[in-house]
């Protein structure tokens, strides 16, 4: 039973969705272009081959014979049944889902099985507040960026904490349109365009895998001769690696300017 006012983060509206827990971003090449190719091919082949109960296995074998299996973390499953749900390629999702197959639920054929796939709720549902959920789903319209951001709890909570402190209230989600939406979108787009992103192959957000367990890749402030930055959590979420104190300062400036611009614009718009 869903609570009143429940916000479905997986499929929030007709313009985007998330497929992160199906392994979407765990491919060695998880650039937008590469994922679009992957999902587009799968969707086409699924529609061509899957007509009856056992066909998904034929589909699976075909996909495995043509796709690169290289992953960031071998321990995280990347499900081949993730594809596009709509012709416009705005929503990613499960090709085995009953809504995609005239009511027939084929998820039992998957690695996790129907029960796990249908019942999974990721930590973002619990830790991201209702206001933050409503705001973020207004700010980000595109599936690729949306999935990266909605699963990054620290990034979301830190940004809203900084702007809330500056405007002395929780920003009202209705305000995320026009210029305010653009400024917030600029911030969340750093998830893709951050200039100080580490190139280490085994990094994902703040985590890296040391061969046996997931560890947080902390920033070595001592080495940079710097105090721990107030934006430390944001830096970690952005997979940062700073080689010099100047790079660290530049990173702080990018974040500071965005937050201050948002605060100023929010206050000015409120007066007008
Ligand atoms: S990571 Fe969370 S929001 Fe994304 S599809 Fe999975 S459960 Fe849904
Ligand atoms: S079968 Fe499960 S893991 Fe695979 S795409 Fe569907 S919901 Fe995701």
Predicted regions and their residues:
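Short loop/turn segments that flank or connect secondary-structure elements
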Residues: 1-20, 26-29, 43, 60-272
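Charged, glycine/proline-rich intrinsically disordered loops and linkers
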Residues: 34-69
């Amino acid at each position: 039973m869903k609570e009143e006012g429940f916000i479905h983060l997986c499929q929030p509206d007709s313009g985007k969705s998330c497929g992160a827990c199906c392994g979407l971003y765990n491919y060695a090449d998880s650039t937008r272009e590469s994922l679009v190719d992957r999902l587009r091919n799968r969707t086409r082949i699924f529609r061509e081959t899957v007509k009856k109960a056992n066909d998904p296995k034929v589909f699976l074998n075909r996909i495995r014979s043509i796709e690169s299996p290289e992953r960031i973390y071998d321990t995280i499953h990347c499900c081949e049944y993730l594809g596009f749900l709509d012709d416009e390629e705005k929503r990613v999702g499960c090709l085995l889902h009953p809504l995609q197959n005239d009511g027939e639920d084929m998820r039992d054929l998957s690695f996790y099985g129907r029960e796990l796939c249908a019942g999974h709720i990721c930590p973002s549902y619990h830790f991201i507040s209702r206001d933050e959920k409503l705001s973020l789903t207004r700010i980000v319209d595109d599936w690729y960026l949306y999935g990266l951001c909605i699963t990054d709890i620290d990034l979301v909570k830190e940004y809203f904490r900084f702007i809330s402190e500056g405007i002395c209230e929780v920003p009202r989600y209705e305000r995320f349109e026009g210029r305010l939406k653009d400024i917030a979108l600029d911030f969340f787009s750093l998830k893709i365009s951050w200039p100080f992103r580490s190139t280490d192959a085994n990094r994902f957000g703040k985590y890296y895998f040391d061969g046996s367990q997931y560890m947080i890749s902390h920033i070595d402030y001592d080495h940079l001769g710097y105090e721990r930055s107030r934006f430390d959590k944001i830096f970690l979420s952005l997979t940062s690696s700073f080689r010099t104190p100047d790079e660290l300062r530049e990173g702080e400036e990018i974040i500071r300017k965005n937050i201050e611009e948002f605060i100023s614009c929010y206050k000015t718009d409120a007066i007008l």
